[in-house]
Amino acid sequence: AGRVQTVALRLIVEREREIRAFTPQEYWSIAALCAKDGQTFEASLAKVGGHKPQLHSAEEAQAVVDAVRQLPFVVTKVEKRHRRKNPGAPFTTSTLQQEAAKKLGFSSRRTMRAAQDLYEGRDVGEDGPSGLITYMRTDSVRVSDAAIASVREFIGSNYKKPYLPDAPNTYSTRKNARVQDAHEAIRPTDVRRRPEQVQQYLEPDQFRLYQLIWQRFVASQMTPAVYDMTIVDLDLGQYLFRATGSVLVFDGYHVLYTEGREKEEGKTMDDLPPIPPLEQGNRVDVREITPSQHFTEPPPRYSEASLVKELERLGIGRPSTYSAIISTLSTREYVKVEQRRFFPTELGELVEKIMVAKFPEIFNVEFTSEMELELDRIEEGELVWQRVLKDFYTPFSKALEAVDLTALVADAHGLKPEDLAKERCPKCGSAIELKTGRFGPYLACVKYKDTCDYVKSLKKARAPDRPTDEKCHLCGSPMVIKTGRFGEFLACTTYPACKGTRAIPLGIKCPKCLEGDLAERRTKRGKSFWGCVRYPACDFSTWNKPVPDTCPECGWVGMEKKVSKAEGETRTCLKCGHKMVLAEPEEVATA
């Protein structure tokens, strides 16, 4: 792995270690379903004795429920707020990749390929070959005065007056040494070309990305969305319940565009239900009081969008290289993607452990970020590249010469040199050495292949069980992800009392029966294939791994991923067979 790829891999591996080390803590919440004049709303326990509730068991929660059931729920405070939600800035390379991942399910590579096509131009009928968007490799949110005048004229002609602000909306590009401001933000070259007018001339991916860019740009010059928020307190003495509601009173830029979100980003004003009209002193009916059990959750694994955001925040790589960085990690099988989240593979963890342990000065975030600044300064003519290369390569070459690859592999597998030196071949009594073959490292007699045939595989440390939300189909108990000789699988937590196991579903529906999920399975010889969990009722199977990409042709979520020297990296829809090329053969060969 290269300098930048290794740091990206390090982020993924370190996040996985955080998750493994995380210990969930139980806590409880209490919600009251209230009603006033026939309209219901929910209030949650906000304080106990003036402090945030600390309920860590069912008994503690039930004690509160029993106490508040006897008390009247009276409104003691009503606070109303007027909130405005401003539109986002036009896209930069990074924000385009993030938003396309959230809203369209596109990988960074898929986004940049479609953007490149739109920039290079398409034949759009009477206008002939035309570039549809501005340059797609930029850190700037700056927009030309002519483009702003054009989009304001478009909004004024096509939307009612309240949607056009009195003055243009302005956005500031982040001010730091890494930002490249030579090109303006990503926008349509002509805002009058509506997405539906050019759809017939575009491939499905190109159309969806153009629509995203066009809508975001037009929305960036529209008025804010306006909400009326209401916060109601119901003070029961020692216990305080609170309800928060929101009503959209003017949609503003939402008439055209709504931002994509990921699960961990939390609720917004759009998610809050309305609250009926209430005044201080009103008594409300309580229909139900419900305690709910929760567990604290570990930090989420990186998605493509959140990894791109973190790389940009840390100053690692350039936005234009993010797609190549992520693609390289996947192509070399350092990471795998499950339900659009990155998991490090065993190989990836091994590579990260070796590289970070032996080259700590090079493969850290600060060094890589500083190197990006120096490369930018070379480009600007402020630094001499030979001096920068010498300053880097001199210590690096010395560190490289000192590396003992065999010792690295041994260390990664927990083998100490002194222990290895003591081992003797059980067949001939000779010394034992560490070797590396096509299936990984192994121990062998020093006379192996000459006069002795003794070999011993290195046992891999079993990965810790990972909790899931799945329930056992036999007994209903929670299931965990375990690792066996043929990979990962779901197993009942009550084993050996219950021997319930099943394959891990990919979160992709079977395209044949439309009922079961697809899951990885193994042949008797251990070769992977993917099939429907309803087998033998459904016999669908494929040798190529399904990924949760959306088919641009039919909209089906589920495409086969295939990488070959002949065709490059492709995706083929499991439902309609539509095929698209994500990387040409030469790109795959150099990844």
Predicted feature descriptions by range:
Residues E99, K103-S107:
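A conserved hydrophobic secondary-structure block that centers on an alpha-helix together
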Residues A61, D139-A591:
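Basic, low-complexity terminal or inter-domain segments flanking catalytic cores
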